[in-house]
A protein has these predicted regions:
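Terminal accessory/targeting
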Residues: 123-124
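Catalytic cores of processing enzymes, dominated by hydrolases/peptidases
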Residues: 3-88
Length: 124
């Protein structure tokens, strides 16, 4: 089974006085395929999902993805979870259960050979 790199972080519900309505964010640059799987599955689970929100996966500072995934043609995605959803044990359990359910199917749904040059991403 080919590896898939998932960079998982959390974000604040409010930044500089502005509410951030997304419950989950899917960050991507070169790998739109993996991002679309995550956006679809998280939306299907009832979450309001941001496409490259609350941050952009196209930012040059995404060291983990740039250096460990894109450089090796490994399928990848950045996931941001709004902190108020995981502030308590029940919320952590719910998010973990949702992610676990569909992550088990990822290797069969994402082919590593589809990464570069076939979706408008970076080319070697």
């Amino acid at each position: 089974t080919a590896p898939i790199l998932i960079s998982l972080h959390s974000f604040t519900p409010v930044l500089n006085g502005v509410s951030r309505t997304w419950e989950m964010g899917v960050l991507w640059d070169a790998d739109r395929i993996t991002a679309e799987v995550f956006m679809h599955e998280l939306s299907k689970a009832g979450y309001l999902v941001g496409d490259n929100e609350p941050y952009s996966g196209k930012a040059p500072q995404d060291f983990t993805i740039d250096h460990h995934a894109e450089a090796r043609d490994i399928p990848h995605v950045g996931i941001e979870v709004r902190q108020d959803l995981i502030h308590h044990a029940d919320g952590v359990q719910k998010v973990a259960a949702v992610m676990h359910r569909f992550m088990k199917s990822l290797p069969a749904r994402i082919e590593p050979t589809k990464l570069r040059g076939k979706q408008g991403g970076k080319t070697a």
